[in-house]
Amino acid sequence: MAQLTGSEILAKALKNEGVEDLFFLMGGPMLLAEESCIKEGIRPIDVRHEQAAAFMGQAYSRLLNKPSVCMAASGPGVTNLITGVANAFVDCVPLVAIGGSSPFKTYGQQVFQEIDQLGMMKPCTKWAERVYTLSRIPEMVNVAFQKAMVGKPGPVYLDCPGDLLYEKIDEEEIDWSISGRALPRARPHASSEIIDETIDVLRTAERPVIITGGGILWSDASSELQEFVEKTQIPFYTTPQGRGVIPEDHPLSFMTVRSAA
């Protein structure tokens, strides 16, 4: 009966979620996981500092409108990720951060590079959790992707103890039941009453300006926004997180028509 290591299970689970590219800085205990990702056909993008991996993942997600994955070694590798992860939290970017950690069996004994990585990640993520059993790795990976995308997008963190990554388990014991489950796409709708009230306010407004943020980007509503702008002829301004949803050289761009607003 074939067996898989935790690292191999992690790589296969990421592949099932549609991951094509991985941003990381090689280091233990993630070396086998990173090698396994490459064997699964995931393109490795190795950086010189973990913070760069998180920022590159953030840019990747914004450009492709989908989750990205960054990976780091235990201890200082994970702490180096935090600034990039925190930035993704502020900008509502679905970044999946995966960090190696000291062995689960020796937690609390101050072993090599042991630090409370979960405690540091929780304030700057939507969800942070640790892998406890090999059989549930695919489930945990899918939940991480689900949490990153549901509602307002944002970063998540999955902590992977080194001893679990190198342990083996029979393939038939692995739970793949929700691996690769379709991701939610947040497109919230206002009630008809609020929409009617908004229309009434716009009818009586003298110098309206539309201000849009990153929600337009993540809900994939750029075309709807542009249609609304052009039908109403209301100038628009985008926050830094929402730039590019309508071309900035559009005749109704705030930078172009601000003197008429």
Feature roles, as predicted:
Residues 1-261:
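N-terminal alpha/beta PP-like core and its mobile active-site loop of ThDP/TPP-dependent enzymes
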